[in-house]
């Protein structure tokens, strides 16, 4: 899509950084209440808006009768919009000027205040707050949450990588995938990564810095999917740059084939768009730029066709991580700058030779999954 002029990217980045700095670090990586903490901070920021600033910070979404926050890229239904700004003295410009909800006041003054109307919303990684297609303007729900990171020693993480994936070619490919996604949010990596191994060997620990590099400690723009999530009527989980499939497995052969078919449009493009079904709101088509990462302990979690081009599959024979080693690694991650150092390394890694559209390299383990 063609990008329309919206908020200046440097001002948006500065505002978002100021907000993130107000979030207290609890020391918990991806804690369950992280989203609640961020939402509370955002509500506090909204309450500080003056009435004169609202039209510059919001746009009206026509099909949903709702309002789009151009800073935090969130959608508010009319009732929620009224509630958030109920503290403001919003009065109608008609009659004797009775007090009205913030939504009505916004609508009445939209033209005079230079407010925007949108044809809908979108989720387009790498794009600005306002995007256009076929002459229509959309509000982009994606906002860059990548931390800058800090240059430092990443030896503990590279040691874990070598332990999990001893083959240097396979390991280099996975590192390139992570670095490319960190550096290029607007580009689809047209295959998924599947890492198989025994429980407790450090699969989650290995990929944690990558997820941090995409969305910070709050893990924005990354989603850990539940087992039956993609069979749900609503598909909010697709509104992410990275989708993690934990414990990928289907015991029956027919179910393994069905799952592989179900994941095809998510893993690779085309299709160039995916439909997001939303409760109480109109569905919309998001741009298919997500990357899929899967873990499993099952030696045969899915069945692949002989012509498969969508999966890079690695079997790790690493032993279970020692508890003290795991504790030391996570202490380094959370308290000694490990997450920031790995995130920065991924940002700086040279991936100029990596082709995100190419078929992934063949692995011995992938041949075992082919029917």
Where are these regions (language model features)?
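AAA+/SF3 P-loop NTPase mechanochemical coupling elements
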Residues: 232-238, 276-295
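Phosphate-sensing "switch" segment of ASCE/P-loop ATPases
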Residues: 285-290, 304-371
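Conserved catalytic/switch belt of AAA+ P-loop NTPases
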Residues: 215, 258-284
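Signature of the SF2 helicase/ATPase Hel1-core->accessory helical subdomain module
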Residues: 264-271, 300, 318, 346
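Conserved AAA+/SF3 P-loop NTPase catalytic/coupling segment centered on the Walker-B
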Residues: 241-268, 301-307
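N-terminal nucleic-acid engagement/recognition segments and initiation subdomains in replication
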Residues: 2-170, 186, 235-238, 300, ...
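P-loop NTPase catalytic core of nucleic-acid-dependent motor ATPases
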Residues: 127-248, 259-260, 312-315, 346
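Conserved nucleotide-binding/hydrolysis micro-motifs of P-loop NTPases
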Residues: 249-250, 297-301, 317-322
């Amino acid at each position: 899509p063609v990008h329309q002029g919206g908020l200046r990217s440097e001002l948006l980045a500065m505002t978002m950084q100021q907000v993130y700095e107000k979030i207290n670090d609890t020391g918990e990586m991806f804690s369950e209440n992280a989203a609640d903490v961020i939402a509370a901070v955002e509500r506090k920021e909204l309450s500080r808006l003056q009435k004169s600033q609202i039209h510059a910070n919001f746009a009206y979404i026509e099909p949903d009768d709702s309002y789009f926050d151009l800073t935090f890229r969130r959608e508010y239904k009319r009732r929620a919009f009224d509630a958030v700004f109920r503290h403001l003295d919003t009065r109608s410009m008609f009659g004797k000027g009775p007090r009205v909800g913030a939504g009505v006041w916004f609508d009445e003054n939209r033209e005079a205040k230079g407010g925007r109307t949108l044809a809908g919303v979108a989720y387009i990684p790498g794009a600005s707050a306002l995007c256009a297609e076929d002459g229509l303007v959309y509000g982009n729900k994606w906002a860059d949450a990548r931390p800058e990171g800090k240059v430092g020693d990443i030896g503990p993480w590279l040691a874990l990588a070598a332990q999990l994936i001893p083959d240097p070619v396979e390991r280099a490919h996975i590192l390139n995938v992570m670095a490319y996604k960190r550096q290029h949010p607007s580009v689809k990596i047209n295959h998924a990564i599947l890492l198989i191994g025994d429980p407790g060997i450090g699969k989650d620990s290995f990929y944690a810095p990558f997820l941090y590099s995409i969305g910070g400690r709050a893990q924005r723009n990354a989603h850990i999917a539940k087992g039956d999530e993609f069979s749900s009527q609503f598909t909010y989980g697709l509104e992410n740059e990275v989708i993690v499939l934990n414990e990928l497995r289907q015991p029956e052969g027919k179910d393994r084939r069905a799952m592989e078919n179900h994941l095809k449009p998510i893993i690779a493009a085309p299709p160039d768009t995916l439909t997001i079904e939303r409760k109480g709101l109109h569905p919309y088509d998001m741009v298919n730029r997500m990357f899929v990462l899967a873990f499993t302990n099952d030696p045969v979690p899915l069945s692949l066709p002989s012509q498969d081009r969508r999966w890079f599959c690695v079997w790790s024979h690493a032993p279970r991580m020692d508890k003290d080693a795991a504790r030391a690694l996570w202490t380094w991650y959370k308290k000694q700058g490990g997450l920031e150092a790995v995130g920065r390394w991924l940002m700086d890694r040279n991936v100029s030779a990596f082709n995100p559209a190419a078929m992934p390299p063949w692995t011995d383990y992938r041949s075992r999954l082919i029917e």
